[in-house]
A protein has these predicted regions:
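An acidic, low-aromatic, low-complexity terminal/linker signal
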Residues: 1-138
Length: 138
């Protein structure tokens, strides 16, 4: 879905995904809960006839579940999963090469990369998948 070199900004604002990581954006996704999954996992959703796990960005960021929202389907190293977020703000360009990123904010997870002031912080999908909360059943 995504073109290399661009970002897709998500709600809550200030976070974005690289467009090349995106497969599809699904409004009002049907997510089936899974007993025993970790707190950040909302359940399973259908993507092109197959099931993918869906994690909740709100829970990952501040512990609060996302109400309603959209699911962005993501591909990383051949694996696919969904990320539930409050919404999608839209596409935007990557910051220019001279734009210096700020320092990570206190409490930011490792997978939320620093960005220049006024730009969204990019979610590093590989680092997100390595987060211990994303490792499945508890």
């Amino acid at each position: 879905m995504g073109a290399p070199g661009g970002l897709m900004e998500l709600e809550p604002g200030g976070r974005a995904l690289r467009q090349e990581d995106l497969i599809q954006i699904i409004a009002d996704p049907a997510i089936a809960p899974v007993t025993g999954a970790g707190d950040c996992w909302r359940g399973l959703a259908n993507l092109r006839g197959g099931l993918i796990g869906v994690a909740d960005l709100g829970v990952l960021l501040d512990g609060r579940p996302t109400e309603g929202g959209v699911m962005v389907a993501i591909s990383c190293g051949g694996d696919e999963f969904g990320l539930l977020c409050a919404g999608v703000r839209g596409a935007r360009e990557l910051p220019g090469p001279d734009a210096l990123p700020d320092e990570p904010l206190a409490g930011d997870p490792d997978w939320l990369l620093p960005a220049p002031p006024g730009e969204p912080r990019v979610i590093d999908v590989e680092l997100l998948l390595a987060d211990e909360r994303m490792r499945g059943a508890s």
